[in-house]
Amino acid sequence: MTTLSHDSTTMPRTQRDTRRMNQFVSIAAAVAGLLFGLDIGVIAGALPFITDHFVLSSRLQEWVVSSMMLGAAIGALFNGWLSFRLGRKYSLMVGAVLFVAGSVGSAFATSVEMLLVARIVLGVAVGIASYTAPLYLSEMASENVRGKMISMYQLMVTLGIVMAFLSDTAFSYSGNWRAMLGVLALPAVVLIILVIFLPNSPRWLAEKGRHVEAEEVLRMLRDTSEKARDELNEIRESLKLKQGGWALFKVNRNVRRAVFLGMLLQAMQQFTGMNIIMYYAPRIFKMAGFTTTEQQMVATLVVGLTFMFATFIAVFTVDKAGRKPALKIGFSVMAIGTLVLGYCLMQFDNGTASSGLSWLSVGMTMMCIAGYAMSAAPVVWILCSEIQPLKCRDFGITCSTTTNWVSNMIIGATFLTLLDAIGAAGTFWLYTALNVAFIGVTFWLIPETKNVTLEHIERRLMSGEKLRNIGN
């Protein structure tokens, strides 16, 4: 599909053709998000049984959770090079193959050390997918649907989480954690098949000097040949910078600003604290008075469904509401939710809680997750794919995605330690304070990029405009 050398004018395409191609690209690439979500969700239900099987301490439990994030940071760190050399399409293929290997290795682990290694391999795959899929979608989509297409990736992440929670709930009666982990290989095989039929990114093709192929792909994706030609001309204009990556980062202040903003955005996303709910939901609900594994898993499933439905709404609102309003509202909702959840858990610690506080705790986790799903979860990935200059996009997104996974690893590897050190209330109130701080950062620094082309954002950035104004 990407090695077409004949003149595309001999192959007229209808708007229906372009719509179908855009839908296929969106769905196929977003399956990478499904894999990501499956792994986030599955460990929450599997961890109690893994802990019993291997007799794990709290520290080892944290490492079973966070070893995946360590691998993801490694995968994201090297994926800039991989994506530049192989292209976005074949980077997704490599990630899918590694996902199969990591899933099978986790299911057949005979020691905690073997499980940790398999989880790291799985993490490398997730790191590749989390880097490549949003980048690929941002480069394939037109500016008016770019946010929607990238939000589809986040929707598939949440669908994966819900599917994992359903699987965990089903297997929780038998405690079969190996089946919980091994079943993840199946969607990875589906992704391998889908990637075969994906076209290469036109921006990557143009960067490699393959302009005829780039225009052919753009004609598949855009409503008219004129739009395809105009976009290719803009891409070629942005490629006139002679340097790229690290070399450009060292000498160009504006590039450094974009890279550091992407890193800050990803750190903000993780330090909202929402992923600790995904990783440790059964433990949180145990602290909130749900005594049986089945009760904890049902409450966890409710949170997962909330995440999925809120993300579904976000898919259709992110390109209408804008990036900044979504972030400001989302951080506010998460601040309130973690504040009240901390209060509820303090009452349970003091032994003064009523049964109603158990359900209020569930309600607050649902509120937090809904706020996250409609703001930081999709919007940060959208912004990070939008703000990087083309010649430095691989490097910039490598830096931001690596920051995401390092931050993710930190929150995953410290949650149980924080519970022991400052208690459940103190832990969630810490995240309340961070979310309040992020509201201020959004006002001060974050740009609005709704309905703006990537090339226009790049021109504003490189002209030295304030970061909050580069989307204007």
Swiss-Prot record:
Transmembrane segments: 30-50, 64-84, 92-112, 115-135, 155-175, 179-199, 258-278, 298-318, 326-346, 362-382, 405-425, 426-446
Pfam family, one: Sugar_tr
Spans within the Periplasmic topological domain: 51-63, 113-114, 176-178, 279-297, 347-361
Keywords assigned by UniProt, alphabetized: Cell inner membrane, Cell membrane, Membrane, Sugar transport, Symport, Transmembrane, Transmembrane helix, Transport
Compartment list: Cell inner membrane
GO cellular component terms, semicolon-separated: plasma membrane
Predominant location category: membrane
InterPro entries for this protein: MFS_dom, MFS_sugar_transport-like, MFS_trans_sf, Myo-inositol_Transporter, Sugar/inositol_transpt, Sugar_transporter_CS
Covalent S-S links between cysteines: none
Role this protein plays: Uptake of L-arabinose across the cytoplasmic membrane with the concomitant transport of protons into the cell (symport system). D-fucose, a nonmetabolizable analog of L-arabinose, is also a good substrate.
NCBIfam families named in the record: SP
Family indicated by similarity: Belongs to the major facilitator superfamily. Sugar transporter (TC 2.A.1.1) family.
Protein's name according to its UniProt entry: Arabinose-proton symporter
Organism: Klebsiella oxytoca
Lineage: Bacteria, Pseudomonadati, Pseudomonadota, Gammaproteobacteria, Enterobacterales
